[in-house]
Amino acid sequence: MATEKTYPMTQEGKQKLENELEDLKTVKRKEVVERIKIARSFGDLSENSEYDAAKDEQAFVEGRITQLENMIRNAVIITDNGEESTVVTLGKTVTFKELPDGDEEAYTIVGSAEADPFEGRISNDSPIAKSLLGKQIGEKVAIQTPGGEMQVEIISVK
């Protein structure tokens, strides 16, 4: 028997998924059913692009509902007491400077379900996070990126 994949996430991340699931079940699902109903009224379904598009959207919505239910059911909540730490762990925000130029970057390391690089939230499965997890303030770390290896020094962990 295979074990189900777990999804590490913050309580906030789980709440966002629950909100999306609720919206899909209560709003989107009904909208799609209504679109299918309207498209059916146009007659011949064999050449009815509105019907095909609505059925495709229905399949997407139902697939996303299943995916969200699975992620929520298998969520492992990352607890963070908000205190500074010396070790980079899941749920923490790590600030590091690139060597030798000193440019600083900060990322919060979260589970893949709530990663959003544009918001500074990177997946624990990303190359940057994998390189930083378990390291301490002051450590110099080599990070493999698509542009090559970069050397960084960890400045803070919150």
From Swiss-Prot:
What name is this protein filed under? Answer: Transcription elongation factor GreA
Q: Which GO terms describe its molecular function?
A: DNA binding; RNA polymerase binding
* Pfam families given in the database record: GreA_GreB, GreA_GreB_N
Gene3D superfamilies assigned to the protein according to its UniProt record, in alphabetical order: Transcription elongation factor, GreA/GreB, C-terminal domain (3.10.50.30), Transcription elongation factor, GreA/GreB, N-terminal domain (1.10.287.180)
**Listed InterPro entries:** GreA/GreB_C_sf (IPR036953), TF_GreA/GreB_CS (IPR018151), Tscrpt_elong_fac_GreA (IPR006359), Tscrpt_elong_fac_GreA/B (IPR028624), Tscrpt_elong_fac_GreA/B_C (IPR001437), Tscrpt_elong_fac_GreA/B_fam (IPR023459), Tscrpt_elong_fac_GreA/B_N (IPR022691), Tscrpt_elong_fac_GreA/B_N_sf (IPR036805)
Species, as recorded: Bacillus cereus (strain AH187)
Please state the gene responsible for encoding this protein. greA
Family recorded in the similarity comment = Belongs to the GreA/GreB family.
Could you tell me what this protein does? Necessary for efficient RNA polymerase transcription elongation past template-encoded arresting sites. The arresting sites in DNA have the property of trapping a certain fraction of elongating RNA polymerases that pass through, resulting in locked ternary complexes. Cleavage of the nascent transcript by cleavage factors such as GreA or GreB allows the resumption of elongation from the new 3'terminus. GreA releases sequences of 2 to 3 nucleotides.
Q: Cross-referenced PROSITE patterns, in alphabetical order?
A: GREAB_1, GREAB_2
Keyword Membrane among record annotations: no
Keyword annotations for this protein?
Answer: Coiled coil, DNA-binding, Transcription, Transcription regulation
> Which one GO biological process term can you cite for this protein?
regulation of DNA-templated transcription elongation
Q: Which residues form a coiled coil?
A: 4-75
